[in-house]
């Protein structure tokens, strides 16, 4: 099977001249410039380190006014741990002052400020993405964006109903040496760059908004289709983004998937995993990994996302514009989407 894959991959690349990667859907792009979206963003990471030069009570009052409950969340989860009942101001101050002067923490913050002296680029990307999100999902409410230092533990996540928190330290670039010391796998690092900040921020909002995740009641194929729906939505929110960024693959991995789509589909069918509800299979084909077991090294992990995306694209093409993006996400079961997609790579 591996030899067959390698032969087909090389042969198809020779014929295609590697143009598969640049082949994308062409569709009208709506004008969202007039949508009334106001993006408020704050640098919790920088404000936190202002404690080094300020009186504690005044600083804390300012932090609570600006960040609300996220201040206590950060304190409990990154600085001090669960606080005892009663007045803990003295404990807070001692722990926070130790935290902001800690050599390791300061090194991470220095790296953040070196890569992100400001977040204007990310805010431009997020503002445009939120406009598209609002256009396609009118009930979408724009969150306040908080950037913070997660000590290499958290990327992007909604916080409550009105805030989105982004750990900038998870997007410092694959050359960041600290990623070695904290054990970040090499195969993940191409996604830990500034270009991915807005993409993963919007994905986290999508997951929260649609309560998206792998449904334990679904078979593997249905889980792939649902993942494909999410990636397809991201392609509308980021219309200029290449498939590699949307899928989280490298360019070479994306080229492999494009040129070997038929063989990938055959491989999954031959494995007889698509119509079974097996959590290990879902993890194997939809989870993060350096590659997919049984396939060539060029194949990415999480290869089910690519197949799911292609099924959804086929479905939307078959509907001829009769199904809106909103309806795609909310009305139709994954099984129906696959059956009506007439997917035949």
Language-model segments: residues:
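Acidic/His-rich structured neighborhood in mature extracellular/periplasmic domains
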Residues: 93-254, 323, 330-334
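N-terminal mature-domain "stem" immediately C-terminal to a signal peptide or N-terminal signal-anchor/transmembrane
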Residues: 19-93
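C-terminal soluble interaction/assembly domains
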Residues: 275-345
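C-terminal motif of bacterial Sec signal peptides marking the signal peptidase cleavage site
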Residues: 14-17
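Residue-level recognition of alpha-helix termini/interfacial anchor residues
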Residues: 63-77, 136, 252, 256-261, ...
């Amino acid at each position: 099977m591996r030899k067959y894959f390698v032969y087909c991959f090389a042969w198809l690349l020779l014929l295609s001249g590697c143009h598969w990667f640049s082949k994308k859907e062409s569709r009208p792009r709506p004008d969202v410039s007039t949508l009334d979206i106001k993006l408020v963003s704050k640098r919790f990471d920088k404000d936190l380190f202002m404690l080094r030069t300020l009186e504690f009570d005044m600083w804390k009052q300012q932090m609570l006014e600006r960040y609300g409950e996220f201040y206590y969340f950060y304190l409990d989860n990154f600085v001090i741990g669960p606080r005892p009942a009663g007045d803990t101001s003295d404990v807070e101050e001692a722990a926070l002052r130790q935290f902001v002067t800690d050599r390791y923490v300061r090194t991470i913050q220095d790296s953040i400020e070196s890569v992100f002296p400001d977040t204007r680029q990310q805010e431009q990307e997020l503002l445009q993405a939120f406009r598209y999100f609002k256009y396609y999902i009118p009930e979408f409410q724009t969150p306040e964006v908080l950037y913070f230092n997660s000590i290499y533990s958290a990327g992007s996540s909604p916080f409550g109903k009105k805030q989105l928190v982004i750990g900038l330290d998870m997007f410092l670039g694959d050359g960041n040496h600290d990623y070695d010391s904290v054990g970040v796998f090499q195969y993940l690092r191409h996604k830990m760059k500034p270009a991915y900040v807005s993409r993963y921020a919007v994905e986290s909002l999508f997951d929260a908004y649609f309560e998206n995740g792998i449904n334990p009641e679904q078979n593997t194929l249905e889980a792939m289709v649902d993942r494909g729906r999410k990636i397809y939505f991201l392609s509308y929110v980021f219309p200029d983004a290449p498939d590699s960024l949307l899928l989280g693959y490298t360019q070479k991995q994306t080229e492999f998937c494009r040129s070997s789509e038929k063989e990938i589909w055959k491989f999954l069918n031959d494995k007889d995993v698509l119509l079974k509800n097996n959590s290990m299979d879902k993890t194997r084909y939809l989870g993060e990994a350096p590659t997919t077991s049984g396939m060539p090294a060029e194949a990415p992990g999480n290869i089910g996302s690519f197949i799911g995306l292609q099924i959804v694209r086929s479905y939307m093409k078959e509907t001829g514009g009769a199904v809106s993006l909103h309806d795609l996400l909310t009305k139709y079961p994954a099984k129906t989407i696959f059956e009506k997609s007439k997917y035949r790579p």
